[in-house]
Amino acid sequence: MQFDEEWSKADPIVHALLHQKSVTPAAWQDLFYHVYKITSWVDDGPLKIRDILTRCINDYVHEANKRIRSLQTDGSLLIGYIKEWNRFYQQANILPLPFKKIDESSRRRSVPETPEESIRTVMLEKWNEIIFMNISEQLLVEALRLVKEERDGNIIDAQNVIGIRESFVALNDRAGEDPLLVYRQSFERQFIEQTTEYYKKICGNLLNELGVLEYMVYADKKLEEEQQRAKRYLEMNSPTSGKHMEKAVIALVESFEDTILAECSKLIASKDVERLQRLYRLIRRTRSGIDTVLKCIDTHIRTEGLNDMRNNAENLSTDPERYVQQLLLMFDKFSSLVREGFCDDARLLTARDKAFRAVVNDSSIFKTEMMNKKGRTLSVESKCAELLANYCDLLLRKTQLSKKLTSEEIDEKLNQVLLVLKYVENKDVFMRFHRAHLSRRLILEMSADQEKEEMMVTKLRECGMPSDAVNKLSRMLQDIELNKDMNSSFKKALTGTNNNKSIADSINMKVLNGGAWGRGGSERIRFSLPRELEDFVPEMEAFYKKQHNGRKLCWMHHWSSGTMVFGTANGGRFDLECTTFQMAVLFCFNDRAHDKISLETLRLATELPDAELNRTLLSLVAYPKMRYQILLCDVPSTTVTARDFTDSTKFLINHDFNVVKNGKSQQRGKVNLIGRLQLSLEANAEKEHESIVALRELRVQEGIVKILKTRKTYTLAQLTMELVEILKPLFIPNRKIIKEQIDWLIENKYMERRADDINTFVYIS
C-alpha cells in the first residue's frame, strides 16, 4: 500500500475540518478508516501521518495569522483573534479524534524522557508559537480595557475576555509543567492589579459624596459584581484565584473599615435589619472587622437587657412568671436580631449567648447573698435560679396558671425554662429550690400531672444536670408511687381492728427515703400529737416493721398535713386543710370552744418549740388571704406579728368566722391554711442559702482532692482552671471559696504548698 495514494483520500477531509467546512458523516468515518489502513499497512505510517499533518496545521495557522494581522486596531485585533481562536480551539478538540491511533503508537515508541506530543498538543503549540506569543500583550491590554468598561457600567461581549483567558490556560498546558503558571504571571496578575487600581481611584471620593450608608450599598453591589466577574473571567482552579476578591475587599471595605464600623452600634440600636445585613456582608469578608461587630452586639445585649430588667424590677422580683417571660422576650428579640441582621453567624450566636448569660447572671438588680454558717458573705449571685424554680412550681402545681394552660402549652413553657436554665451559672441553687418545690407538691398531692413531673426529671437529665441530683428527684417520684401500694395494704390491715375503719379511710401515709428527700432524723422536733392521732402512730410503725425489718422510721410531723372539720357556735361548718402543728393547736379548743387559752397553756399541750408555736399561731390569727381569722387574740396591735406574742397572750375561737366569696359571707366552705408547707426547720431563706454554701464548700474540697490525687503536683492556675471545669455544670466557684477551701485542706493535711513555690500544691497521700 502506497502512503501518498491513501493519504490523498484523507487529505481533503483534514483540510475541510481545519477550515471548518462541512464534512459528511460518511467522510468522517472514512477518515478513521484511511488513518487505520496507513498505520497498519504502511511502513512508518504513523510518522508520515504526523509529519504531513503537522505541515497542514502549520499552514493553516499561518493563514489564520495573516487574517488576524490584517486587522490594524487593537479592538479589531482582539475581535479577529477571538473569532479565529474559537474556530481553531473547537477543531483542536475534534481533529485529533481520528488520529488517536497515531498518538498511541507514538507513546509506545517514544523514550519516557522525551515523549512525542499528541496531535492536539501540536495544534495548540503551533498556534501559540506562530500567533499568540507575538500578540498576547496586545490582546491582554485590550481584554482588560473591556473589563474596565464593564466596571464602568457599559455592556461588553464577555466572550472576548473569556477567549483570552482560555488562550493563556490552554496554550501553556505542557506535560510535567504547571499549566497555569503563565496564566497566573500574566492574565491573573494584571487582572487583580487593575481591580485594585480601579477602586482605589474612585472609592475615597465616593464615600465623601454618598455618605457611609449609601457607600455601603455601592460597595455591597460592587463586591457582588466582582464575585460574578471572577467566576466569568478567572480560572477557578488556580490556587491564587481568591486573591482577586481579597484585593477587592481591601480596596472597597478594609480601607474604610473604621468608618463603616462606626455605624454598627447605631444600626443595631435602631434594629435596621436591612442595613445590618449589608454591613455584615461587607465586614464578614474582612480579616478582623467581625471582632468589632461582636463587641457591638455584646454591648447592646448587655445594656438593653439590663435596662429592661431594671425598668421592670419592681414587678418582676415578686412574679416568677413575668420574670421568666421577660427573659424569654429578650432572648427572642436578640436571637431575631442575630438571625435577620447577621444570618445566624455562629460567631454572633456565641456573642449573643455570652451577653445573655451575663444578663441572666447579673446580680445588680435581682440578687441573693450567699452566706456561710459564720454569717460571712461568700458571693452575691443572681436570683434567676430561684425565680426559675418558682416558675416551674407554678407550671407543675395545681395553680390558676397550670389550670388555664393546655398540656402542650405547659410542655412548651417547661422547655423555655430549660432554655433559660442553660445560661444560669448557679444551677445548684435551681436544683435545691426545685427539689423543695417538688417535695411540697408530692407531699401535699398538689402536682397537676404526674407525667409532667417525670418528664421534667428526664429533661433535667438530658440537659446535663448532675446525675446524683437528678437521681434524687427520680427517687422521690418512685417513693410516691410505692406509697400508693403500701397505703392500700395498710388500710386493709387496719380495717376492722379496734373499730379503726373510719381512720383507715382518712389516713394517707408517705414513707420517704431520707437520702433522696434531703432530710433526716436530725430535723426531728419535740411535739405532742393530738390524742386523735397518737394511737395511729404505733400501729403504722408495727405494720411497717413487719414488711421491712431493720428499717427505722423518723416521723417528720412538720411535713404532715390533714383536713379537719371546724364548726362555730353560729352554725358555720368548714373543712380546714392545715398542717399537723395547726391541727394540734386547734384540737386544744375541742373541749374549750368558748374559752380563752394562753400561749403558755398551748405550749404545754403541744410541746412545740417557741418559734414553731408562734409561727403556727400567727398563721391562725393573721392569715393574709382571709378576711376572717380562725382564732382571735388579745394583742392590741392592728397588725399582729409573732413578736407580739407573750406567755400571757390569750387565744380563742372566732365563732363569727366566715368564708367570703365574691363579696358574700358563707357559712360553708373549704379553707386551705397550709400555704407554703414548711419542709424544713430553718427559719428563713438565708438558712437555705447557708446549706447551699456548705454543700458548695464540700464539692470544692472534693474536687481539689480528686484533682491533686491524680496530678500529684499542680499550680494554683492549673488547679483553678480544672476545678471550674469540673464544677461548671452546677456552679462556678469564685476565688474566695477556692482559697478558703485550699487553706482548710492544707490545715487538715490533705495537701501542702511546695517549699520553693507557694503557688504550687502537692497532694499528701
From Swiss-Prot:
PTM statement from Swiss-Prot or TrEMBL: Neddylated; which enhances the ubiquitination activity of SCF-like complex.
Disulfide cross-links: none
SUPFAM superfamilies, per database record: Cullin homology domain, Cullin repeat-like, Winged helix' DNA-binding domain
Record-linked Pfam families: Cullin, Cullin_Nedd8
UniProt xrefs under InterPro entries: Cullin, Cullin_CS, Cullin_homology, Cullin_homology_sf, Cullin_N, Cullin_neddylation_domain, Cullin_repeat-like_dom_sf, WH-like_DNA-bd_sf
Keyword Ubl conjugation: yes
Keywords on record: Isopeptide bond, Ubl conjugation, Ubl conjugation pathway
Xref: SMART domains: CULLIN, Cullin_Nedd8
Subunit comment: Interacts with rbx-1 and rbx-2.
Family (UniProt): Belongs to the cullin family.
Physiological role: Probable core component of cullin-based SCF-like E3 ubiquitin-protein ligase complexes which mediate the ubiquitination and subsequent proteasomal degradation of target proteins. In association with rbx-2 seems to be involved in meiotic cell cycle progression in the germline. Required for phosphorylation of the MAP kinase MPK-1 in the germline.
Protein name: Cullin-5
Organism ancestry: Eukaryota, Metazoa, Ecdysozoa, Nematoda, Chromadorea
